[in-house]
């Protein structure tokens, strides 16, 4: 899902020319680290911001990314990360509210696509309103995304058996 959103941020012309995007990522936990690794391996210019010194050092030493120790909701830190020139901004901290705040500040400071991870199901009915009011390109709820993917899988025994044996129904 992240990959599709990032892909849509690039124009077809940029993809043909091998254009690498400038991506600022707030949150160096499991998801943030995995994203930093994947995006840097794809040749993008990635900057990771986190408040945990050990995480920042690990990410900076392990991957071809710039890592900054700081608060992703600080305009000073966002400026240091180059959010003004960023194509994409992604917030994946452990706090939904911090993710939304970071995206709001990033949108005000630059002209990037902003993506926030929001896990709390109580926000699920307000996501469109939040996206519109803050100007966020996408809000991703991992649990809802997983449920949507699973719902597209064949669930009947007949379909599962046909898939197992390679027969078409």
Question: Which role fits each region the language model picked out?
Answer:
Residues 1-20:
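Short, Lys/Arg-enriched N-terminal segments with co-localized hydrophobic residues
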Residues 32:
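N-terminal Rossmann-fold NAD(P) dinucleotide-binding loop
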Residues 50-51:
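Conserved acidic E/D residue at the C-terminus of a beta-strand in Rossmann-like folds
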Residues 159-169:
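Single conserved hydrophobic/aromatic residue that forms the stacking wall/gate
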Residues 39:
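Aromatic pocket-lining residues of Rossmann-like dinucleotide-binding sites
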Residues 22-25:
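Beta1/beta-strand and adjacent pyrophosphate-binding region of the FAD-binding site
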Residues 57-153:
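Phosphate-bearing ligand-interacting subdomains
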Residues 28-29:
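Glycine-rich Rossmann-fold phosphate-binding loop(s) that bind the pyrophosphate
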């Amino acid at each position: 899902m992240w990959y599709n959103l990032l892909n849509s941020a690039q124009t077809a012309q940029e993809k043909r020319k091998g254009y690498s995007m400038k991506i600022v990522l707030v949150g160096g936990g499991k998801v943030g680290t995995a994203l930093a690794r994947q995006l840097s391996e794809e040749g993008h210019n990635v900057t990771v911001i986190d408040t945990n010194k050990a995480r920042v050092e690990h990410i900076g030493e392990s991957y071809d990314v710039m890592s900054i120790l700081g608060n992703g909701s600080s305009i000073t830190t966002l400026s240091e990360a180059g959010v003004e020139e960023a194509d994409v901004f992604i917030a994946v901290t452990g706090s939904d509210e911090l993710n939304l705040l970071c995206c709001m500040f990033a949108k005000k400071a630059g002209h990037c696509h902003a993506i926030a991870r929001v896990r709390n199901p109580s926000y699920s009915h307000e996501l469109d309103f939040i996206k519109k009011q803050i100007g966020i390109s996408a809000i991703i709820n991992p649990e809802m995304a997983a449920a949507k993917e699973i719902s597209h899988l064949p669930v009947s025994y007949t379909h599962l058996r046909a898939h197992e044996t390679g027969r078409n129904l």
